[in-house]
Amino acid sequence: MHSKPSRLPFSLALRLTFFISLSTILAFIAFTWFMLHSVEKHFAEQDVSDLQQISTTLSRILQSPADPDEKKVSKIKESIASYRNVALLLLNPRGEVLYSSAQGAALRPAVNSADFSEHSRARDVFLWTVEDTARAMDTGSGMKMETYRIIASSGQATFQGKQQNYVMLTGLSINFHLHYLDALKKNLIAIAVVISLLIVLIIRIAVRQGHLPLRNVSNAIKNITSENLDARLEPTRVPIELEQLVISFNHMIGKIEDVFTRQANFSADIAHEIRTPITNLVTQTEIALSQDRTQKELEDVLYSSLEEYNRMTKMVSDMLFLAQADNNQLIPDRVRFDLQSQNSLKVFRVFSEALGPKETPILLLKFNGMPCLVEGDPQMFRRAINNLLSNALRYTPEGQAITVSIREQESFFDLVIENPGKPIPEEHLSRLFDRFYRVDPSRQRKGEGSGIGLAIVKSIVEAHHGRVQVESDVHSTRFILSVPRLEKMIPDTQCWE
């Protein structure tokens, strides 16, 4: 069954362009809407003000008792003429027309609307749209719609020689305003489309230019290969947003370079370590075959070859052990035990007895007898301590003592193995636990050490969530093996076998 390939995420440049453009366009749309709304509101306020002023003026003219009808009509026409697109309709209570301007008939249907009485009592302004039949006939085009703002008022006036009630509808055509708003809206939409395209283009260019340092960093990273792992990026030459990325990348490259260097040295060292016993075996065999040998001589050659085979076997076993540690396959059997129990002390006593009383240094144990509870694999701990003691023995001058002590820390027990001898230069201390690393620049093997004993110690300690470190001064060298401590005695506590 074939799995569907996952869709690649959008590029960072596309995302930035989209979101910035969208934000800018939405802001422009909001500004356009606000401007249209402001213009429309201004027109409405202006129309209402004009209608209220016209209605007040006309009511004053109608309610003047001294003026005859003709004079009132004349004043009404003069008042209307001073405004543009004003329609007036004057009705008596029976609905008969007392006076109508040229466009007054368009207001007649508004009287029959359901909300007219309410608008009339409140004297508020309302909208009314009618079909402009006259204008459609004049222009010969389709039916036109005329929209008015209307204010209705009522009162009593002397008209046609008698006092009578009237209803006055004053309307102001707003088609001019509506046409202006419609044209403004279309123009703004066209401008918005053009500006939006320009915004997207400008932002795209700006984002691409802004990503130039990122592309430069990417190109610089592409140029780093296994042949120039010493190359580093300059954090001071990139924007502050990329500074931490460059620092982290340099740190990663430093680790990779260190791994490559160690791998190269490891390959050379293991080749040297294996070549030496193989060369010895070949040489011994060639010498043995160069002439007739007695049985005793042949046995000596075989015993010598067996020693070389054992040394190679131990080296291969150690390398397999380290390979397990590298692949996180080194899983210790965890049991609880006391570092200072009698069975635990046997590890050191057996080693001390094996040293002999004269020609080797003395092993001193400085334990306080208090419980030192830890959890781990006793066999692995034995191997780590044996490696440290063997290393201390190798570099301790004749007749001087190796000291083993335990120090209590807040959450660790420190097992300290200290031996006198020449101080180790500080620049070598951090590399002592590397495989086949030697303080001697010639990197030649001396004695019986394989060069990976301390590396095994480090792997064992780290598998137990501990740490190992080394200190050196003019008096002595101290290897400190720190193991997590248990807080209290556990009933099933075991000891080293």
From Swiss-Prot:
Q: Which SMART domains match?
A: HAMP, HATPase_c, HisKA
Q: What is its main location?
A: membrane
Q: Gene3D superfamilies per the record? A: 1.10.287.130, 6.10.340.10, Histidine kinase-like ATPase, C-terminal domain
Name the InterPro entries on file: CusS-like_sensor, CztS_silS_copS, HAMP_dom, HATPase_C_sf, His_kinase_dom, HisK_dim/P_dom, HisK_dim/P_sf, Sig_transdc_His_kin-like_C
Q: What molecular function terms (GO) are annotated for this protein?
A: ATP binding; phosphorelay sensor kinase activity
Q: Which UniProt keywords apply?
A: ATP-binding, Cell inner membrane, Cell membrane, Kinase, Membrane, Nucleotide-binding, Phosphoprotein, Plasmid, Transferase, Transmembrane, Transmembrane helix, Two-component regulatory system
Bilayer-spanning residue ranges = 16-36, 187-207
Phosphohistidine-modified residues are 272
Query: What membrane topology does this protein have?
Result: Multi-pass membrane protein
Enzyme Commission number, as recorded = 2.7.13.3
User: Residue ranges, Periplasmic compartment?
Assistant: 37-186
Domain Histidine kinase span(s) in chain numbering: 269-487
Among PANTHER family, the record links this protein to: SENSOR HISTIDINE KINASE CUSS, SENSOR HISTIDINE KINASE YKOH
Annotated protein name in UniProt: Probable sensor kinase SilS
Gene source species: Salmonella typhimurium
Q: What is the lineage of its organism?
A: Bacteria, Pseudomonadati, Pseudomonadota, Gammaproteobacteria, Enterobacterales
- The protein's gene is named silS
